[in-house]
Amino acid sequence: HEIANVMGTDGIEYMLQATEDLPVDVRFMLPSCVPATPLDESGANLDYRAIDSFYDHPRVQGLAEMMNFVGTINGDPQVVEKIVASQAHHKKIDGHAPDLVGNDLNAYIAAGVYSDHECADIDDAMKKLKLGQFIMIREGTAARNLEALMPLIKSQKYFSRCMFCTD
């Protein structure tokens, strides 16, 4: 989503074109929050209409980390429009929900958020797994959660609902 924060849809188009015909298969999730917060100044303001046509691209997999968990939980119309558009195209919605619990977590997942990469400990990951989410285990420069979440990988019960990511 960073390139969209700077360049808007031109940035998304650039990334799709720049990764064509590479020896690796590069897939994309569309930015959910551009700008990242209502107070941010950004190179663009992308609503669901701005990104909708990108869902038809074969390498676009869905909507990236829905960072506006407050808007998701409270049914903010702009957030709901983005979620509904992604679902209408039969695409996934990745999450970004640190420390959500209880009814807030239930509402967030019920909105259709498929996964989360913000689990820093096993308890948070287990809550989300039991509610049906997939867990992205981060091991990168900003966060290192592999050691804390290793029991999920070792578990016969949960390893198939886990994946690795750098952010």
Label each region the model flagged:
Residues E65-D167:
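Active-site core of metal-dependent hydrolases
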Residues H1-H90:
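Divalent-metal coordination cores built from histidine and acidic residues
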